[in-house]
Amino acid sequence: MIELAVIGGGPAGLTAALYAARAGRSVAVFEGSGFGGQITLSPLVENYPGLGAVSGMELGDRMYAQAEAAGAELTFSRVQRIERNTDGTFLLETEDGAISARAVIFAAGAKPRTLGLPGEEALVGRGVSYCALCDGPFFDGQDVAVAGGGNTAFEDALFLAGRCRSVTLIHRRKTFRAEQALVEQAAQRKNLTILTDMVITDLHADNGELEHLLLKNADGRETRLPVSGLFVAFGRVPDTEMAAALAERDQEGYLLTNDRMETAAPGFFAAGDCRHKQVRQLTTAVSDGTLAAVSACRWLAEQ
């Protein structure tokens, strides 16, 4: 029996483990894909206070090392199921066996929806991005495209239009899911072009960097769009299915918490991109992890 199990080894989970371990709690972090989370895919991180410019991989490695040095047990094993024991503790079934914990911090994150095109994954960090706020500054003065038709796509396009030479928003339908006010704002930007009834069929790279997109309209006609950046804004999918029986979720599947990261289930906390919130950034994930750990430690002390 451990005191605290953390599911997910990204910035939120590693921060939670760091704080809980420093508070003297026995902590185990379970991660099935790779410690550090999605930030490790970023070639350069410039918006984490105090570090200047650092690669995402180096930042993830530093977080891992710091949590481990504090005394957290970091286990490369995927949690497959969580259930509540009759005594109120939690049973976690992992790839390597079962373990019980008095409290759980769920920080499994959320994955971006992709285009699903060949070569897309290889171009992440080399022209393809799923976060305009994170990576937009790397494309100042360049020609970029945004794929999507919802609020996020238009917000990204407007943000990028303020710093890029040109922005092309590409949507597969004639109508948008975005609020009309955002659509009207985008239509007024001189360096922002909106293409409808259009899909991206191919990503062409030159020397490993995105060079142009191949587009196809409803009539099957293909066109070539030269861009150095593509921001895919199809939304994200939270990895919360295994927590559905324990905690409440919103319509998109994100876990609902209060400002102390507590879910409706006593002793079950959530942190990072998997929970319902307005902004999903590296710094907000770290903040969530801190709050979740402090709340979990207080909860453990009260039991």
Please describe what each predicted stretch is.
Residues 10-11, 34, 110-112, 150-152, ...:
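Residue-level detector of alpha-helix initiation sites
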Residues 135-162:
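Conserved FAD-binding catalytic core of PHBH/FMO-like flavoproteins
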Residues 67-94, 98-101, 162-259, 298-302:
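A Rossmann-like FAD-binding core segment of flavoenzymes
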Residues 2-70, 154-179:
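Beta1-alpha1 glycine-rich phosphate/pyrophosphate-binding loop at the start
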Residues 1-7, 23, 28, 74-142, ...:
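FAD-binding core/adjacent interface of flavoenzyme oxidoreductases
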Residues 17-18, 41, 116-119, 157-159, ...:
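Short amphipathic alpha-helical segments
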Residues 116, 122-138, 234-281, 288-291, ...:
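FAD-site-proximal beta/loop scaffold in flavoenzymes
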